[in-house]
A protein has these predicted regions:
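Hydrophobic residues on the short alpha-helix immediately C-terminal to a glycine-rich phosphate/catalytic loop
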Residues: 2, 18, 157-161
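Flexible "cap/lid" loop of the alpha/beta hydrolase fold
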Residues: 4, 10-43
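Short, structured coil segments at secondary-structure junctions
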Residues: 9, 104, 130-132
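Active-site loop signature of alpha/beta-hydrolase-fold enzymes
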Residues: 21, 118, 145
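Conserved alpha/beta-hydrolase catalytic His-Asp/Glu region
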Residues: 24-26, 43-103
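Short aromatic-enriched loop/helix-cap "lid" or pocket-rim segments at secondary-structure transitions
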Residues: 24-29, 122-124, 149-151
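Conserved loop-alpha-helix segment in the C-terminal half of the alpha/beta-hydrolase fold
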Residues: 108-142
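Catalytic active-site module of serine/aspartate enzymes centered on a nucleophile-bearing elbow/loop
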Residues: 132-172
């Protein structure tokens, strides 16, 4: 949203395991589900959600353990986790439904885990790359949280991107 409001202030854009906000990428059903994630999370048995959440977001033991640790901070109140996740998904749905152009008018890099299983993130990144011509780097042996599965590779790509943007003399 910041980029939409202040495009001249952006020096570069990196998306890690994310998705475009343009409505044209989403189906009506996907938006509908985003708006209703909270009640789904509330009826999902907590222990099952812990397993699905950690395995669904990461491929490595390290990445899965980080996700599980974060989720376990809500172990005493899983409904709070559902509220927080639901809020995030609703905000995402609102941004998509705003149907703004969300133009990326600066150097950009899309990063996505080759084994990303979170929603349609992997297919969104393929389409985003094809439609907008944005560079896309696939991270081997990585899921939706590719920066926790392969932090060295993700950091290398980020550092390379920054050095290329800085080397072009783009003012910020």
């Amino acid at each position: 949203m910041y980029m939409e409001l202040y495009p001249d202030k952006i020096k570069g854009f990196i998306s890690i395991d994310s998705a475009p906000l343009q409505k044209s990428y989403m189906t009506a059903m996907e938006i509908w589900l985003l708006e209703r994630a909270e009640p789904l999370y509330k009826i999902y048995p907590w222990k099952a959600l812990l397993g699905a959440g950690s395995r669904g977001c990461a491929e490595t033991d390290y990445g899965q353990n980080l996700m599980r640790k974060m989720m376990m901070s809500y172990d005493s109140d899983p409904r709070e986790y559902a509220r927080l996740a639901g809020f995030g998904y609703r905000m995402l749905a609102e941004a998509i439904k705003a149907d703004l152009p969300y133009r990326i008018s600066c150097p950009a890099l899309l990063i996505c885990g080759e084994r990303d299983k979170a929603g349609s993130a992997k297919s969104y990144n393929k389409k985003w790359h094809q439609r907008e011509g944005l560079p896309l780097k696939w991270i081997k042996n990585a899921g939706h949280n590719s920066n926790t599965d392969q932090p060295d590779e993700v950091n290398r790509l980020i550092e390379k991107f920054f050095s290329e943007v800085d080397g072009k003399g783009v003012s910020g």
